[in-house]
Regions:
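N-terminal membrane-targeting hydrophobic helices
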Residues: 1-221
Length: 221
């Protein structure tokens, strides 16, 4: 995986552009009259976009374009990508928990944001999870804290374009400018890549070097 993290390929650039376009497309759909006229359609589009953003964000980190399909399935890369997408979508379940009902209208009509939308919780929970993973030497899920961070923080950044970041207990920021929101969404995976490059703890020997493609002849951008 170390080679994946140190090479910027056309594949990773394509995934990055796709990530930005999914954000823009999802936001555009949420302005369409046929979507905003229905709470269900609006919720499905919004949550689906969150899921795709999480999925593509971790795909940028893993860069599956460098790996053969067999390695993707055999190793955890594909499942990590899917997990990041699912976790990013699941963040919105706290709307229903806070509303105390599964009725969509009630979940969308909360007077304040539910707990999982407090951005200050993200580093606390992710660091706690990292502590547990390291304390119990759970090597197979050692990247889970990073996956959760990407899924959760990308969800918050996307929401912040409309409502700002909720920095409990201090309050909320102003809504993020649209260009800043898109920039942050695109930058998050590369921040994670940089962090993973600091130490081999995140990568480790999970993939035998013979399964990794040679970087010879890879197109750089």
């Amino acid at each position: 995986m170390d080679k994946i993290l140190t090479v910027l390929t056309r594949g990773r650039l394509f995934l990055t552009v796709t990530l930005a376009m999914i954000c823009i497309l999802g936001d555009f759909l949420l302005t369409c009259a046929t979507i905003i006229s229905s709470n269900l359609r609006r919720a499905l589009i919004d949550n689906g976009t969150h899921g795709l953003v999480g999925l593509l964000s971790w795909a940028v980190v893993v860069n599956p374009t460098l790996l053969p399909l067999g390695t993707l399935v055999r190793e955890p890369f594909l499942w990590e990508i899917l997990l990041c997408g699912v976790l990013s979508s699941l963040v919105d379940l706290d709307h229903f928990a806070a509303a105390g009902t599964v009725k969509l209208q009630n979940a969308l009509s909360l007077k304040s944001r539910p707990p999982c939308h407090a951005t200050t919780l993200i580093p606390v929970i992710c660091l706690f999870l990292l502590l547990i993973v390291r304390l119990f030497k759970l090597q197979r899920i050692r990247r889970l804290p990073l996956i959760l961070f990407v899924a959760w923080f990308s969800h918050h950044i996307r929401d912040a374009a409309r409502r700002g970041l909720w920095l409990w207990p201090w309050g909320s920021t102003s809504p993020l400018p649209y260009w800043l929101y898109i920039t942050l969404i695109v930058v998050i995976p590369y921040l994670v890549i940089s962090l993973m490059n600091v130490t081999n703890y995140w990568t480790g020997p999970s993939v035998d070097s013979k399964h990794l493609p040679s970087v010879t002849g890879v197109q750089h951008v």
